[in-house]
Amino acid sequence: MAFIDVKNKKGTADKEPPAGYDSWLDFWEKKKGKKATQCEVMRCNGSPDIGGHVIKVGEGSKEYILPMCSACNNKPDDEVFKAWDTDLVPVQ
């Protein structure tokens, strides 16, 4: 496991989760097979309010879902933060 650099992805606020999922957080929980217990941004212990859309820095535009608190989800799109690589779930 390793920490990686990620950023919030622009333009995803109105994006609906795939059929069969109540929310993006529900999508993450079902794909990971566990309940989200905290914001997964490094050094944040906030509650996981949403499944935030992030991209890996340097990887292009491939989207991932990460449990995040509202404050971390509202970071500017150009602000880089760290998360565990294993906590990211790809959006297909």
Model-flagged regions — what are they?
Residues N45-Y64:
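Histidine-centered nuclease catalytic patch
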Residues K34-C39, G60-Y64:
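Flanking scaffold residues of small Cys/His-coordinated metal-binding clusters
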Residues I4, K75-Q92:
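Active-site or metal-binding loop neighborhoods of secreted/extracellular toxin and effector enzymes
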Residues I4-K35:
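Short, charged surface segments at domain edges that flank catalytic/cofactor-binding sites
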Residues E59-P76:
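Short beta-strand-alpha-helix junction that forms the catalytic/metal-binding core
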Residues A36-M42, C69-C72:
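Short cysteine-rich clusters marking metal-coordination/redox-active sites
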Residues V54-V57, L66, F81-L88:
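"Short basic amphipathic alpha-helical interaction patches in structured regions
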Residues M1, Q38-R43, D85-L88:
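N-terminal soluble segments of membrane proteins
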